[in-house]
């Protein structure tokens, strides 16, 4: 028996209180784990969809690849990669703060509609679509990583409660109870022996 375990009534009460608290807290942890599992699955789908959207936008942009190097339009194309407004917030999901992307506004290059070919509008639109979709895909991935990390942390705590803390505390409680019961029986036996000796002396 571990020397750290105090075989006293106070220790028994403390261990019983600890076991009750663990038992009360475990359902909350398991509920949070279930919520996080659902949110992670949702985040996985969103991240996958965002990635596909970004890849499709990239392919559409690459269709104009040969036109990117035309010096006359290089400045206009480069400006489309500049972000004017990136509006973000924080969203609380199952106790986890994750980034919420609210609005993305890119720089709108100025050019003469009369002096530029019609396809330039399509080229610049494809660049903007790619940049915006990439920002949203990166945000979705960041949300997923944060939720997965919290799920991992909570899962470890649930396992700790179920596999170690609760069983160990229960076992400690049992050891103390057995010791106190044995000592009580011994004490009763000694008292009976003492009374018997006293009675014998009186006789």
Curated annotation (Swiss-Prot):
One record GO biological process: proton motive force-driven plasma membrane ATP synthesis
InterPro entries: V_ATPase_D
Transmembrane portions of the chain: none
Any one of the GO CC terms: proton-transporting V-type ATPase complex
Keywords: ATP synthesis, Hydrogen ion transport, Ion transport, Transport
GO molecular function: ATP binding; proton-transporting ATP synthase activity, rotational mechanism; proton-transporting ATPase activity, rotational mechanism
Gene3D superfamilies with a match to the protein in the record: 1.10.287.3240
NCBIfam families membership: PRK02195.1 (NF002565), V_ATPase_subD (TIGR00309)
Similarity section: Belongs to the V-ATPase D subunit family.
Function of the molecule: Produces ATP from ADP in the presence of a proton gradient across the membrane.
Name of the protein described by the UniProt record: V-type ATP synthase subunit D
